[in-house]
Regions:
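Long, low-hydrophobicity ectodomains and other hydrophilic envelope-associated domains
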Residues: 1-221
Length: 221
């Protein structure tokens, strides 16, 4: 915990090569970022850790994904099925209810990814990732760091937007997009090619890797 600030939280799984080092790094790195941040002073009050260790490998890969509904349309409630396979070959099916937004474009992509893979995709600049511009944003970003034991689901559409003052503004009307891109007095503006129309997470018991993408052509009827 930090004095007069939101506490940092940790909940993750590390497995494979040097998991102890990875776990220690995951704790020390965000604390170091905050202590050495350039936005303002911050004081560490306390640190509480609960560690569970095991001799067994605990990893899984994303094998396949599909939707229960064959004809997909805007404003539809459906269920996403995600199959993961452990290093021992055991498959597990995860179910995630989700809703296709009413304003979704004719073609959307459904991305299911591990935290590592999602971070790499965001670094390519096609999906907006928040860039901290102050201490509160930095703490929020660190608490939202992608974890190994999560399945991250993103519904993506070709709605251009901008990254403004560290915050993604997606699915902007053409007129608003032109204003943001022309008005440099607001600070650095970066164009985004895709908008996240929906975001979900699924907890797992393993450290997950891999990603799958479904391209969906929405039925207008």
């Amino acid at each position: 915990t930090f004095q007069n600030h939101t506490p940092l939280t940790f909940n993750d799984v590390f497995s494979g090569i040097a998991p102890s080092l990875a776990a220690a790094t995951s704790v020390l790195t965000p604390i170091t970022f905050l202590i050495q941040n350039t936005f303002g002073p911050i004081t560490l009050n306390s640190l509480s850790l609960e560690i569970v260790s095991s001799e067994e490998t605990s990893t899984a890969t994303i094998e396949r994904v599909w939707l229960d509904t064959y004809r997909i349309r805007p404003a539809l409630d459906t269920t996403l099925r995600i199959v993961t396979r452990t290093h021992r070959g055991v498959e597990e099916t995860h179910s995630l209810p989700l809703r296709i937004p009413a304003n979704a474009p004719a073609t959307v992509s459904l991305l299911v990814a591990s935290g590592v893979d999602l971070a790499q995709i965001e670094q390519q600049g096609t999906i907006g990732a928040t860039q901290p511009r102050n201490l509160n944003q930095l703490i929020r970003a660190l608490n939202n760091t992608y974890r190994n034991n999560r399945l991250y689901v993103r519904l993506l559409g070709a709605h251009p937007g901008v990254l403004l003052a560290g915050e993604p503004l997606a699915a902007l009307p053409a007129s608003a997009l032109a204003v943001y891109q022309a008005d440099r007095s607001r600070g650095a503006v970066m164009s985004l090619q895709q908008a996240s129309l929906g975001e979900w997470e699924v907890d797992t018991q393993e450290a997950v890797s891999g990603f799958r993408i479904l391209t969906l052509n929405l039925d207008s009827q």
